[in-house]
């Protein structure tokens, strides 16, 4: 057997450099789009798990409900659609920071899916913001979402970084 680090850049590099054949010491045929195939499968798995979490009542849909779940400490993670406005992301990010400041958990945020993908998986329309809630289905969905995030190697969202800086600067100004 052979191992490849589970991120897109390493898989693509292994395909390009024919490292599977070298590691297995024999000629192997690897699809040129293996990295994309793995991404699609991880994405499908994550979206399916999100749908199951919703059916189990462990997803809060909408900015207001997601923010309330974060502030109450019930949220395991926050999901933002790619189309999410900076203002909505900022408000939920502030709620996440306030929760941490109050001694609550550090709630991760993920921006991996489009509005259409989230809407289809979660059974809603115009799903821009959602929160995964505590429970077995929520934990399982978070595990799959986090695996996709790691595979894609996505850096923190630029809107979130900017919102964090604005919040930190405002806090420094009031001191």
Regions found by a protein language model. Give the residues of each.
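Charge-patterned, long linear interaction tracts outside catalytic cores
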Residues: 159-175
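Short, solvent-exposed amphipathic alpha-helical segments in soluble enzyme
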Residues: 93-98, 146-148
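Arginine/glycine-rich "motif VI" loop of SF2 helicases in the C-terminal RecA-like domain
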Residues: 71, 96-105, 123
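Short beta-strand-alpha-helix junction that forms the catalytic/metal-binding core
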Residues: 1-7
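Short, glycine/charged-enriched secondary-structure capping and boundary segments
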Residues: 19, 92-95, 124-125
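Helix-rich interaction surfaces within compact, conserved domain-sized segments
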Residues: 109-163
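Extended interfacial segments that mediate partner engagement and assembly in macromolecular machines
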Residues: 8-88
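Short active-site oxyanion
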Residues: 1, 56-57, 75-77, 103-108, ...
């Amino acid at each position: 057997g052979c191992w490849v680090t589970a991120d897109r850049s390493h898989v693509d590099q292994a395909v390009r450099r024919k490292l599977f054949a070298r590691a297995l010491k024999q000629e192997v045929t690897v699809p040129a789009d293996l990295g994309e195939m793995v991404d699609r499968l991880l994405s499908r798995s994550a979206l399916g798990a999100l749908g199951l979490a919703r059916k189990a009542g462990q997803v809060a849909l909408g900015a207001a409900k997601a923010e309330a779940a974060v502030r109450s400490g019930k949220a395991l993670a926050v999901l933002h659609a790619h189309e999410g406005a900076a203002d909505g992301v900022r408000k939920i990010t502030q709620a996440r920071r306030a929760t941490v400041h109050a001694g609550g958990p550090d709630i991760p945020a993920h921006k991996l899916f489009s509005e259409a993908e989230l809407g289809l998986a979660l059974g809603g329309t115009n799903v821009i913001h959602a929160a995964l809630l505590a429970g077995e289905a929520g934990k399982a969905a978070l595990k799959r979402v986090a695996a996709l995030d790691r595979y894609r190697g996505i850096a923190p969202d630029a809107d979130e970084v900017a919102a964090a800086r604005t919040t930190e600067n405002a806090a420094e100004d009031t001191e």
